[in-house]
Amino acid sequence: MNNYLRKLVEGQHLTEEEMYKAGLLLLNENILESEIAAFLVLLKAKGETAEEIYGLVRALREKALPFSNHIQGAMDNCGTGGDGAQTFNISTTSAFVLAGAGVKVAKHGNRAVSSKTGSADLLEELGVNISSTPNEIDYLLEHVGIAFLFAPAMHPALRRIMKIRKELNVPTIFNLIGPLTNPVNLETQFVGIYKRDMLLPVAQVLQKLGRKQSLVVNGSGFLDEASLQGENHVVLLKDNEIVEMSIDPEKYGFSRVKNEEIRGGNSKENAKITLGVLSGEKSVYRDTVLFNAGLALFANGKTETIEEGIKLAAYSIDSGKALAKLNLLIAASNEKLERVN
C-alpha cells in the first residue's frame, strides 16, 4: 500500500491494474484503518480517473456476494449521494415507477451516509425487508420485478471502510462508485452524480462494465438527480457511443422548482412523500419523480424518447401499477423464501 500512497502524495494517477490491486488491499483485514483513511483522502485530493474508478469497481465486484447470471434485462437507478442537498428519496421512489412500467429494477442502496435518510432507511420505514440473500433477490426480480440490494450485505468486505467513511464525513471515491458496484449483471443504468466533472469518467466506466445503454446525470445545482431547477448536464451511453448533452425540464412541460423545495426529512417524513407520489398526489415531488423516472425509462430503452418516458412514468403512477409494485415488494420480501435458499 505504501507504494500507492506515495504515488498519490506525488499527485500521480494509478493505472487500472494498480487501483484493482490497491482495492483488494483496502478490503484486506490486515490493513490499518489509518492507511485506508489516508488512501481515500489522498485519492479525493488528487481527483479520480475513469481507470481508477473501474479498477476499484473490479475489486469490489470480485469480493461481493456471488449472483447467478440468469437474470436478464435488469436496471438500477441509483444516485451517488454526496450532493448535500438533503432531497427526498427521488431515485428510490422512481424505482417503483420504473417497475410499474415493466422494467426489472435491481435497486442497490444503503443507509444514510451524507443525507438524513438513505434508500434502506426509507424502504424499512415503508415495510420492506431489506435483508435478502442473492437467491431471494433473484426470486424477487423474476416474480415481483423489483428487489433491493442492501450494499453492506452485498459487500461484507466493506464494513470497515463504511465505518471510516462515516468518521471522515466527506465524500470519497466510494460516493462515486456505489452505483457501479451493483453485483447483479445489469443491462442498463441511470446514474446521478454530484460531481459534474465526473460525468464522462462514470459513463466510460459503465461502458467498460458492458452496459447496453445508460444515462449519467448531474442535475442543476450539482444535484445527484435530475433537477427541475434548471439545466441538467447529461452523458448518454448508447450503441457503445458516448454523447454529452444538456436537458432543460421546461422543454418537457415542467415548471421550474428550486432544489430547496424538494428537501426531505427523516425516514417517516420521506415515506409520507413517497406514498403521496405513488398514490397519485399532484406535487413538486411528483413532478421531480416523473422527470427522473422518464429519463430512466429512456435510458433503459423502454421508450424511444424522453417525452414518451415521462408519459409512461405518469401512467405507471396514475394506473396504480407503481404503488402495486411497492405493496408486492413489501409482501414478498417479508415471506420466508425457503424455496429459493
From Swiss-Prot:
Keywords noted in UniProt: Amino-acid biosynthesis, Aromatic amino acid biosynthesis, Glycosyltransferase, Magnesium, Metal-binding, Transferase, Tryptophan biosynthesis
Catalytic activity entry: N-(5-phospho-beta-D-ribosyl)anthranilate + diphosphate = 5-phospho-alpha-D-ribose 1-diphosphate + anthranilate
Cofactor dependency: Mg(2+)
Residues annotated for 5-phospho-alpha-D-ribose 1-diphosphate binding in this entry: 79, 82-83, 87, 89-92, 107-115, 119
Entry's Gene Ontology cellular component terms: cytosol
Annotated positions binding anthranilate 1: G79, N110
Gene3D superfamilies, per the entry: Nucleoside phosphorylase/phosphoribosyltransferase catalytic domain (3.40.1030.10), Transferase, Pyrimidine Nucleoside Phosphorylase, Chain C (1.20.970.10)
GO-annotated molecular function: anthranilate phosphoribosyltransferase activity; magnesium ion binding
GO biological process: L-tryptophan biosynthetic process
SUPFAM superfamilies for this protein: Nucleoside phosphorylase/phosphoribosyltransferase catalytic domain, Nucleoside phosphorylase/phosphoribosyltransferase N-terminal domain
Self-association state and partner proteins as the record states: Homodimer.
Family membership noted in the UniProt record: Belongs to the anthranilate phosphoribosyltransferase family.
Protein name per the record: Anthranilate phosphoribosyltransferase
Native species: Bacillus cereus (strain ATCC 10987 / NRS 248)
Record lineage: Bacteria, Bacillati, Bacillota, Bacilli, Bacillales
Gene: trpD
